[in-house]
Amino acid sequence: IGDIIGIKGTMFKTKVGEVTVLVKDFTVLNKSLRPLPLPKVDSDGKEYDSFTDLEQRYRQRYVDLIVNSQVKDTFIKRTKIINTIRNFLNEKSYLEVETPILQPIPGGATARPFITHHNALDIPLYLRISDELFLKKLIVGGFEAVYEFSRDFRNEGMDKNHNPEFTILELYVAYKDYFWMMELTESLIEKVCVEINGKTKIEYDSKQIDFKAPYDRISMFDAIKKFTGYDVSNMDENELRSVCNDMSIEVDDSMGKG
């Protein structure tokens, strides 16, 4: 980390069995012009010079990767997750495809698109907000199972968990229902968890989550009743607004049941 050198020499083992190199020549390959913000601890146990400022970490991700190993681990895990999903689907003979990023009509989702202009055709084009419609056209065209890891773009709000460009997996299979998709999703998530962590149980936010399939299934109506105490299955719009008001949920007269 920092200065990088290349060495020439002879490999050997030390008396304690550690593999090392007897250096005969070296070359400076890269010189670090500024000291890295590596954390230091003084005699009182106080740590300083840590690279902890969130704004700096996000804007200088290369430094963050050098000094915070857990960030690099996240990058590696992300790649492993994508590869595991891809292998899982390929083993089932699903076809990975690529669909257009620049589209004449943004579709497949309700979102504000980024707009650009095609000079040769003199027409506006949109960065895709979803690849759904093109994948469905492939199903109509005779491919029975297709999927795509795509970069999608939505010109909307932004926060820690909401980025204007993001990677999404979309999968479509002919002649199947959503119960089948539930089973596929369960087995896929379990497979990924085991491949990445070596087990189905993980710790998240001081809680243990077990991704061992199958998972509990519950309808939306039953979930609302379970967690709020209200049975909304037969309520009209006025009754639903009253329930929302009781739970301090902001609504107005323009909102319907959806």
Located regions from the model:
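Class II aminoacyl-tRNA synthetase catalytic cores and aaRS-like
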Residues: 1-258
